[in-house]
Amino acid sequence: MEHHHHHRHMHSPSSQQHEHQQHQQYQQPPQHHQHYEAPQHQQQHQHHHHQQQQQQHPVPVPKQEQADNTSAPVLSALPAYPTLPPIWDSTHSPALSASSSSTMQASASSLSSLPPLVLHPPSNGLQPNKPRSRSPSSNRFQTREPAPLSLFDGSPTTELPPIQLDRKRSSSDHSLPSIASLNVGSSLPTLQPTPTPQPPPKFVWPNSNPLSAYYAESDNDGRGASPQHRHDRRSTSVSLDDPQVMMAISALNELKTDSVSSPPNRNAPLRRGMTDQNQEPEPLLSLITTAHPIIESTVQRSSHLYTKTKNFSPRIRSGLEYVEGSLIPVADTVNNVGRRTGIESGVRWILGKRTKSSSDTRESGQNKRHMTSRPVNGTGGEARFSEAPTADASRRTSVSTIETLPAYDDQRSPAYSETVEQNGQAVDPKSALHAQLGNGRVQVTTSSLKETMKEESLRSLKYVLETLRDVTNTLQQGTNELSSVLDQYDRSTTTRDGEDHVMTNGSAPEEDRTRLVERMTELRKSIYSNIKDVSSVVANYTGAALPENAGNLVRHHLLSLPMVWSQASKTTTSSEQPNTQDPNALVRKAAKVALSFSKEGLHIFSQIMEIIRTATDHAEDWRNKKMNQMTPANGTEQEIRPLIDQPLPQVATINGDIPMR
């Protein structure tokens, strides 16, 4: 070791010059990206020559330079290229020992078998760093020259050397980390990138309206929406195809209907609804108890007493169970016989009909509200009103009871008359009104004639009546004249066939027939035109003026006109025999069809006139009655408006409340 250190401090000019030339050749970058391959015998010769010079004249190294080289940081401006040739440096070589001479001799023989040295240019087109020229004053900062190849161990290594850079380069330059830092970083665990937290999807409660499910809030800004976010938005949407959604919608509609409607009767049995859901026949005992409330209470008390008696003692329980076991087969046999013979179905039909009628009566009684008032003489002159008993005593409303007329008969016009029902019996309205006035209570009743009570409706109906009268008279005259013209034409044709040429009114028979044909054509067109005009007037002015049942009947008559014309055409064609000798046979046939259609049209329009006249007369009578009832006692006239349009007066009650309008 002492010998080794002694020779390292010695300087040999020839060896330094040779090493300097080799350093320049080694640091020379490849030109034009071409591969440089050194001959194998030249590499061996250089290696052997350096080995001999190293043994004779070791190269001394200054201590300060050694310290600078060992403490200098390793910087890298270029990535490590795996294609670069291995460059051996003294910093990465093992320490030389006393037996280095023998090791060097062994490595000389091993180097002869190494492949040729190949320098590959970088793949990204970057040139390796060249050492900059330094001044003599900055000699200690200059990169140390590589040691001779003879200093290295005989076994080659694949470790890449550090790339020395200029220390004066600014730290702000973009540079890659060193190889040492990369090696240290590779041993550390890999840190996964922190995922960006996604905002939670906005939840919207579904609306009770089914159409709003299709109008979900749209994402106008599609740039920041991710696929996961869109998936979350789609997951909160509501589809009408989902059966659960449909069930929820139906349940909400039922709740809304129940909240708006009047409260149900708590005493009404629920067995009927349960039967509809379970699809099982209701027991006869339940039907009987539902139809007869007295029997229901008796059966319930008896059943309760029987249950208590059965649980009183074990002996009584065993005896009753024995009796039940004997009677149950008998009851099943009777039930089967009644089902097969049809007795059970008849009893069920009777009891079900009675139950339905009683329930309808109760519901109609609950839906009606009566406005009652009773004048009381007070000191303050205020009128006090007494309320009729209702299901909800807190509600003080004044609503008139609406009673509809019976349905129209398809064959006859209904009899319009106002009736007041008391206890299920029809009573004359005058007597009922006097009875109510005598008791101090006034009950206001209306009917489906409220549509005809309006001024616009009455004017429309009166206009239709006048039009029908005029058109009916015109049709009647046209029908009579057309019938007379047809008779004259038939007589003229018969006279011509008998060759009895008689002049009529000083004209020839041919001229008379021509005149009759023209008259038949005019009358036929007039009949069709009048029927068309009157049908349009009736359809346009009676649709909203008449009550629903009367309007349906009028519409039925109007729609039957085309069928009547078709029937008249068939009847005329079958009854008349074609006359090939008469050139005006087609005109005569068309006149016959128009005559038959005119007669049927007169019959239809007379029925429509009767319906409208009856409705108008009874509406006017009803208004006159109301006007007479509201006429003051002093006989002065005042403006009378329809009762349904009059607002209720605001009067104070006992508690100071004002009835609702």
Curated annotation (Swiss-Prot):
Pfam family name, one: Opi1
Gene Ontology BP terms: endoplasmic reticulum unfolded protein response; phospholipid biosynthetic process; regulation of transcription by RNA polymerase II
Residue spans of biased composition, Polar residues class: 173-187
Description of what induces expression: Expression levels may be influenced by circadian rhythms.
Signal peptide: none
Disrupted-gene phenotype: Leads to hypersensitivity to azoles. Accumulates toxic sterol 14-alpha-methyl-3,6-diol and ketoconazole in the cells.
One term under GO cellular component: endoplasmic reticulum
Record-level Gene Ontology MF annotations: transcription corepressor activity
Listed Basic residues bias regions: 1-11
Ranges of Low complexity composition bias in the record: 23-43, 107-140
Basic and acidic residues composition bias: residue spans: 357-366
Annotated region (Disordered), positions in chain: 1-69, 107-243, 255-279, 354-398
Pro residues bias: start-end ranges: 192-203
PANTHER family: TRANSCRIPTIONAL REPRESSOR OPI1
Physiological role: Transcription factor that plays a pivotal role in azole adaptive responses by regulating the drug accumulation in the cells. Affects the transcriptional responses to ketoconazole of many genes, including the target gene (erg11), an azole transporter gene (cdr4), a hexose transporter gene (hxt13), a stress response gene (kts-1), two transcription factor genes (named kts-2 and fsd-1/ndt80). Also regulates phospholipid synthesis that is not involved in azole resistance.
Name under which the protein is recorded: Transcription factor ccg-8
Species the sequence originates in: Neurospora crassa (strain ATCC 24698 / 74-OR23-1A / CBS 708.71 / DSM 1257 / FGSC 987)
